[in-house]
Design a protein with these regions (language model features):
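Hydrophobic/aromatic-rich alpha-helical bundle segments in the mid-to-C-terminal region
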Residues: 3, 105-112, 126-135, 149-209, ...
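Hydrophobic alpha-helical connector segments
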Residues: 60, 73-110, 158-168, 203
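Hydrophobic protein-protein interaction segments
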Residues: 143-147
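Conserved phosphoryl-transfer catalytic core
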Residues: 68-72
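Helix-turn-helix
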Residues: 14, 22-64
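Secondary-structure edge/capping motif, primarily at the C-terminal ends of alpha-helices
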Residues: 76, 119, 186-190
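Helical hydrophobic small-molecule/effector-binding pocket
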Residues: 67, 83-127, 138-142, 179, ...
């Protein structure tokens, strides 16, 4: 039976799918075009026909493993800016990084490895990815942060007067760093940091740590955690 010929879009996607684990394992500089072609089961000539340079292929990966088209963002856009939404966002983020199912990990691990390799190289991939996250996610976070401040559930830290408007986005990034670092510690297949407790317990502890860090009162954390332990209305595909 003759092999089915792929159209241009299908071939490009096949190349991207084959390239992601290679770049994640070896980094941009350490991956050759020959290896990329072999992984995709094509010749280098055909690879260059679809992606004239390795940089263009890398950029395509950025667009696909960034937050574009993430259904969670569509859910966020429908939620009101409230303390409850802020608590839900933080808990959802931590859960996704720390206690995701096998499908979540299969999607997340290559992204984390790509970011780590990028930070060890020129940082361009990580910079562009975080710029995309900033543009798409941070506005939802800061709107709910402002609402929580107005409700009296958060007292901005003293340093906020020094960093001006930037203190709000900093709170997002600090929380993001906590969640991603826990996830990175699990990349070898088992944690290389001796955390106490199971992943679900880590979700609760890390979420509370982040929320306290942004100035939320224990009373507000407890109230909104108890009211909606399912991440403030946010759902994953597995939910």
């Amino acid at each position: 039976m003759a092999a089915t010929r792929l159209d241009s879009d299908e071939r490009r996607q096949t190349i991207v799918d084959a390239a992601v684990p290679l770049f994640a394992r070896k980094g941009f500089a350490g991956t050759t075009t020959r290896e990329l072609a072999e992984a995709a089961g094509i010749s280098e000539a055909l690879l260059f026909r679809h992606f004239p340079s390795k940089e263009l292929l890398y950029r395509e990966i950025l667009q696909q493993v960034g937050c574009q088209g993430d259904p969670v963002l569509e859910q966020l856009a429908t939620l009101p800016a409230t303390t409850a939404t802020l608590v839900g966002m933080v808990r959802f983020m931590v859960r996704r990084f720390v206690a995701g199912n096998e499908a979540d990990r299969a999607d997340l691990d290559p992204r984390l490895r790509l970011v780590l390799h990028s930070c060890l190289e020129d940082g361009d991939y990580a910079r562009e990815l975080f710029d995309a996250v900033f543009a798409r996610v941070v506005p939802f976070f800061t709107a709910s942060l402002d609402a929580a401040v107005q409700a009296g559930d958060i007292v901005p830290p003293p340093a906020s007067r020094e960093s001006g408007e930037g203190w709000r986005s900093n709170q997002f990034w600090f929380g993001h760093h906590v969640a991603t670092m826990i996830a990175m510690a699990a990349l070898p297949g088992r944690y290389c940091v001796p955390y106490a407790g199971r992943p679900e317990a880590l979700v609760e502890e890390a979420s509370r740590f982040i929320l306290r860090g942004i100035g939320m009162s224990d009373a507000a954390i407890a109230a909104h955690t108890a009211r909606n332990s399912g991440a403030g209305g946010l759902k994953t595909a597995a939910d």
